Amino acid sequence: AEWGGGWGGHSNPDYGRIVTLGTDHLREIISENSKKYPDEAWFYRSCSNILDALDIFGKRYGEEALKQAENCDNTEDKELLVRMAKAFEAVPKKPAYDFTSAICSFMLIFALDGSDSPGRFDQYMYPAYLKTENKGEVKELLGRLWEYFHDHRSWNLCISGSDENWNDESNELTYLILDMVKKTGYNTPNLTCRIHKN
């Protein structure tokens, strides 16, 4: 699902579905819905085509990451490229298994869709954050992501908020993002913090 106009920067793709479910699971949903709604078969075919493109894009990114890792002299960069190549063996077809793989899935959609709003980043990335043993990797990746956002205009990133019963949905990732914004001083992406009565 996507909200917004047909111009860059004013839409919010549902990154969370790809990050948490993967394209294989989304294909199952598409298949079920195309049987339920045969008059909309053209729409579901186009959805499948987009998922195919995303998978091809991911495969190419994985190959490129491995190629760059082989020629990289910087130890830190080489380790990241190897982690990315490993991640792209799974994502976007499968759900993200840690923060590196979640960032890889996110970036595929972000690049393919044309640098739109990251949306409620701390919410859909949090499950992957919890699966990541080395939280230092999360900070490193957030730092690199914020540099990317700064160099390639992105629009609105939303944090915090509540559920339908006013339970606070802030989490550790919410505060890491706030720290990153404070540390970098960048105004891209625009940061929206949802405040609620509790």
Placement of each model-derived feature along the sequence:
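Conserved catalytic cores of very large enzyme subunits
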Residues: 1-47, 76, 80-88, 94-198
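Extended non-globular scaffold/tether segments
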Residues: 45-56
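Hydrophobic faces of stable alpha-helices that mediate helix-helix packing
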Residues: 55-62, 122
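Extended amphipathic alpha-helical scaffold segments
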Residues: 61-66, 126
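Short, Lys/Glu-rich amphipathic helical modules
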Residues: 65-81
